[in-house]
Amino acid sequence: DLFIGTNGGEWRCFQSESGVITPENLNIELQTSIGGYKCKPVITPHGIVFVQKHGATIRELAYNVLANSTEGYSSENLSILAEHLFENNIKRIVYQAEPYSILWIVTEDFKLVGLTYIKEHEIIAFHTHNPSNTLYHDVAVIPGFLNDELWVTVSRYLDGQYKTHQEVLVWRPL
């Protein structure tokens, strides 16, 4: 399957017969009419996490078997209990699989927010990482030797001025 996100909805493209998708056997179906924002969605083990079209809500598009035995894709609001963290729009979202399942979010007001998301254990926990005099510009996850590494572009106020540089946040067991 191929998924297409627009500001008007989330679409699923699939072949009508077995094999590969071609112009002759292509089907396109609207899955939800939520709509996405301009930042790139991320793939997690359970679905596609994206920012809703107005820029301040995090959603997951995932396949579900519903109570009435119907099947299909639905979109769950992951940030419903953390709306106060996203008063300004979300700029970037990335996924760090190891050592923990964490979505990292940078907002347009230069804040860094983490979302520990372990769906099979029903864990949805937001945490902020915003020391004073610190502005987060961007974030990336890069595979490391043992774990995924979280890299940030950050400005810190030092000696009377902001200095911008790259930092890697490393997980170490206690």
Region locations from a protein language model:
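A structural signal for short, well-ordered beta-strand segments and their strand-loop junctions
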Residues: F3-G5, F50, I105
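Surface-exposed extracellular loop regions of Gram-negative outer-membrane beta-barrel proteins
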Residues: F3-S18
